């Protein structure tokens, strides 16, 4: 972008309202009027007041609040519940409140009707505190006595043009009409920016939404975004990016169960990953979630546990039966529960509540137990979209998410699917099942997938006891898995067989040693006989040698005697 294009681009005024500046790419158009329209009770006045308060406190921009309906005292009392002390801001001359009473019967509809007196009053208020922002609440009261649309349009144009000349960023609230965005049906045409607030009730659940209908000089989305009025003001659900560009961690964190860590190469899950545990009722899904939550708290990190089925007290009581006490982590506020029925909020509002929890509590682990209950808050497509946005958001915040899901179907290996259909989004997927054989019901666990890490492909028997959790290698026979009593009996039988084989081996070993001893004795006797024969041979050879020497000596002696007696 060139310097010239940058200088011509629209300058925006940040509102400070949580999430709103994100969906408008920076806020409201600076130095221009913005119309906030909607039905009664949707939050128009609150939006305008927060715009002024945030500007004065966070951005150092004083503001003027002009009310045509409520008095200054009423406004101060109404917003005090949100923790805003307008009285102090007024005393510090950061905000000026001016209540202008307009009586419709006193307005004379003539060709000379204008707002010159209003301009003088507004100009004085703006100059008095050096205001950069202004709120007019509500515009209908000002023109309530006029029926000539030409006059209304002309005066609206004059009012908006005058506000632009003053260089203030203006927010004007307006009541929604029957067929138009406003009662007059004119305000939206002369406004540079139009924001529509709405309140909808679907299946007895009310949801407030906000929509940017018009924004001159700026790109904007036409989508409706849910918002909530909280204890500290308005919060708009931020946009979840559809671009998969979040960073990932190489750090591994414990599952809270040493034997389960071993199934993941002794290191556990990846931090910031998504984990899914599926299984039928009673297989131990909540138990795995609770041990992971405990491991998180033991590291000094925070865990947010979203329970959609049981109360926190019931969850903690049930976990005490397997020796898991979560009360220390609740007392230290490392663990927080948010237990609400799915029917309390629709999916958009629930997603917004989770955003709010994450923003304020800053957990490193979020548990949703169970996720399958949320299907009652919407159809399958809406529920899948909800979890897709939730997982993407938590991953972008480097927060690990642990989901449990109740699956149905027959017992066996045919439950490798989720009703919501989010298994493809999961980095790690564990399956819990129960086997009912010979009057017993035993739990088993195995890992269906775990992206980016070596993991066991073996089945483990999942045992819950007063001492906690134990994962034992299940006996796998010909086409079946033996657990519980069958596994124990099979182990005992194998031990008995091994003992008998060992005894037979010892007997064979002793027989071999005896045979070896006898053979060795025979070998020793033969070796002695051979040695005796060797000695006899040596004696014979010695005698033969001596005989030959004697014969030679005799010959030499005879020869010598013949030589001596020979005649000369």
Swiss-Prot record:
Domain KaiC: 11-250, 251-485
Database matches in Pfam families: ATPase
SUPFAM superfamilies linked to this entry: P-loop containing nucleoside triphosphate hydrolases
A GO molecular function held by the record: ATP binding
KO phenotype (gene knockout): A kaiB2-kaiC2 deletion mutant cannot be made.
Record keywords, A-Z: Hydrolase, Kinase, Phosphoprotein, Repeat, Transferase
Known catalytic reactions: L-seryl-[protein] + ATP = O-phospho-L-seryl-[protein] + ADP + H(+); L-threonyl-[protein] + ATP = O-phospho-L-threonyl-[protein] + ADP + H(+); ATP + H2O = ADP + phosphate + H(+)
Annotated positions of the Phosphoserine modification: 423-424
EC id: 2.7.11.1, 3.6.4.-
Family of this protein: Belongs to the KaiC family.
Comment on protein domains: In the homohexamer the 2 domains (called CI and CII) self-associate to each form a 'donut' layer; the compactness and local conformation of the domains varies over the cell cycle and impacts function. CII has the autokinase and autophosphatase activities, both CI and CII have (weak) ATPase activity.
Function: Autophosphorylates independently of KaiA.
Subunit-structure text: Multimerizes, probably forming homohexamers, no interaction with KaiC1 or KaiC3 is seen.
Protein name: Circadian clock protein KaiC2
Organism: Synechocystis sp. (strain ATCC 27184 / PCC 6803 / Kazusa)
